[in-house]
Amino acid sequence: MSESEQYSRNTLMDFIEYRPLDIEICDVTLRDGEQTPGVVFTKEQKLAVASELDSMGIEVIEAGFPVVSAYEKEIVKEIANQGYDSRICCLSRAVKGDVDAALDCDVDIVSIFIAMSDMHLKYKYHRTLEDMLGCAKEAIEYATDHGLNVRFAAEDASRTPIDRLKQAFKEVENEYKVQYVSLADTIGILNPTTTHYLVSEIFKCVNTSICIHCHDDLGMATANTLAAAEAGAKQLHTTVNGIGERAGNASLEEMLVALRVQYGIERYDTTKLTALSRMISEYSNITPSVNKAVVGQNAFTHESGIHVAAILEEPRTYELFLPEMVGGKRNLVVGKHTGTKALKGIINSIGFCLEREELCALIEKVKVCTDEKRRSISREQLEKLIAQVRQEQKPSASEKEKFSI
């Protein structure tokens, strides 16, 4: 099967008008992902993850927040000096000391953030918009004067008046040479429609590349990020397995596969996604849900007889994309919904061949067993049932004697 046949293309996209995507990925697993409560990565782990992201073709890696600790700063600096093709970014408050830490780390990009929503100005900063914007401008000027590329990030942008965002972004764009302006849906309040509107409005008034950073509090982070891309966002933020604050972020694996299947963007090495997911699961001690898109245990697991019978002939009947495309494996399960044709295909695939009478007897045993255990049957259990059927189907001694007369 050729590369182009590894997935089914969404042909409905041919009828939809949208701006051609001009995107790059900024993976923030090592920074926002590590802000998942209880998650702490070691230096060796961060280096391993960064290496994988680089090898996949991820354009930007957000390596950390240097002022968090001396150890964090050491890690960010080491990642920045690995010679990756990926550009390395770090987070910074609108504070000179934070920018100095970024400079010490040799990063390519510093993300200087402030919030401009009434909620954050009143309850977090206890300062005016003018004060905070002034701090941001000072930090941006200091960073650009020292040769850093700057991303000016608006935290809680989704609850900030659009006119306020436009004004702030235009001022910064006109006064300083920033590479990006960034919109953060900090509490995951957006949906695809409002995301598209927000990004479209900002796109109209700035010449600088737009970044989108979505959280998954309503389960729409990936969809919102794609909507932002259609509206003109350049840099899309992701984390592996969608880990991050609270409900997490847009997931890297969903994003890369969606970009490939929906928009034909195939430059990322998606075959590494499953292994990378397992790596992050091990390092974070957080296992993705079994039905997690792309990398969940059940992403390519099938039990229903109708489904399995079709998959045995053509996997794409019930799979949007083949598991090989993301480095995964298909798993055909015997359970309550398994049919005779599917069962025959499954037992043949593991080296068994039964006569029709034996197969009919086996399917009955499978139904009884799954009803009793209330779960699918493991391969070991299936082999035991096959042995039982063969034993029961053997002719008795009297029958053998009758046949020999």
UniProtKB/Swiss-Prot annotation:
Reactions accelerated catalytically: acetyl-CoA + 2-oxoglutarate + H2O = (2R)-homocitrate + CoA + H(+); 2-oxoadipate + acetyl-CoA + H2O = (R)-dihomocitrate + CoA + H(+); 2-oxoheptanedioate + acetyl-CoA + H2O = (R)-trihomocitrate + CoA + H(+)
InterPro entries, A to Z: AIPM/Hcit_synth_CS, Aldolase_TIM, LeuA/HCS_post-cat, PYR_CT
Pfam families listed in its UniProt record: HCS_D2, HMGL-like
Domain Pyruvate carboxyltransferase: 23-274
CDD domains per record: DRE_TIM_IPMS (cd07940)
Record carries keyword Transferase: yes
BP term (GO), one: coenzyme B biosynthetic process
A Gene Ontology molecular function term of the record: homocitrate synthase activity
EC assignment: 2.3.3.14, 2.3.3.-
Pathway assigned to this chain's UniProt record: Organic acid metabolism; 2-oxosuberate biosynthesis
Keyword terms: Transferase
Known role: Catalyzes the condensation of alpha-ketoglutarate and acetyl-CoA to form (R)-homocitrate. Can also catalyze the condensation of alpha-ketoadipate with acetyl-CoA to form (R)-homo(2)citrate, and the condensation of alpha-ketopimelate with acetyl-CoA to form (R)-homo(3)citrate. These reactions are part of the biosynthesis pathway of coenzyme B and biotin.
PANTHER family in alphabetical order: HOMOCITRATE SYNTHASE, ISOPROPYLMALATE_HOMOCITRATE_CITRAMALATE SYNTHASE FAMILY PROTEIN
Family: Belongs to the alpha-IPM synthase/homocitrate synthase family.
Protein name: Homocitrate synthase AksA
Organism in which the protein naturally occurs: Methanosarcina acetivorans (strain ATCC 35395 / DSM 2834 / JCM 12185 / C2A)
Gene: aksA
